[in-house]
Amino acid sequence: MTTVIWDFGGVLLRWDPAALIARTLPHRITDELGPQHWKEQFFLSYRGEWGEYDRGVMTEAEMVPLIAKRTGLQVREVQAVVDAVPAELQPIEQSVALVRALRDRGHRLHYLSNMPAPLADRIEREQPFLQLFESGVFSSRVKISKPAPAIFTLAEQAFGCDPATTLFIDDHPENIEAALAHGWQARLFTGADAIAAELRQL
């Protein structure tokens, strides 16, 4: 039996931050400063303020004015993007179906997600697919985020999993590299269809 540990954003929940910003701040999108530019400026590859928000060491109220000051966006514009995130994080049904199929075949299922506390709370309240998992770890609850090695150690202890029979699925290469370095098996998620055949072989 394999333990399969899933990421959420971009894997089980839709997460396209460039499209989110384009929808929320269309007046900011120009030929020179397109959605990808604003995604990079806003989120800084999750290493800036949003990364601290993910890690549970910065509140939304603290984060919003800092992003505004750094990017030149208005505070209300930054807040509008933040407010639009919950609607973006909707289940990817093909991915959820894969989780359900693994559960039905008897595999142990957990999640390991970088997620700010308000969004983690909302996901727990609103997403029925969480019932498919035995347990999970949100970065904001433990004050550590991927790809820090400590979060993989913590997750392994919390889940009681054997690295040799643990498969981690995530959409960020640096997180995959960190999981492999920890001794887990790991696969980069590029879409439900791409990984479905591999999961059927478990």
Model-predicted regions and their roles:
Residues D104-G106, G183:
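Glycine-centered short loops/turns at secondary-structure junctions
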Residues M1-A97, D104, P116:
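N-terminal helical cap/lid subdomain that shapes the substrate entry/recognition surface
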Residues T24, L102, L199-L202:
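Alpha-helix C-terminal capping segments
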Residues T2, W6, P116-L202:
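Asp-based, Mg2+/Mn2+-dependent phosphohydrolase catalytic module
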Residues S113:
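Conserved phosphate-coupling serine/threonine residues in phosphotransfer and NTP-handling enzymes
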Residues A97-R100, D104, Q157, E177:
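Surface-exposed alpha-helical segments enriched in charged/polar residues
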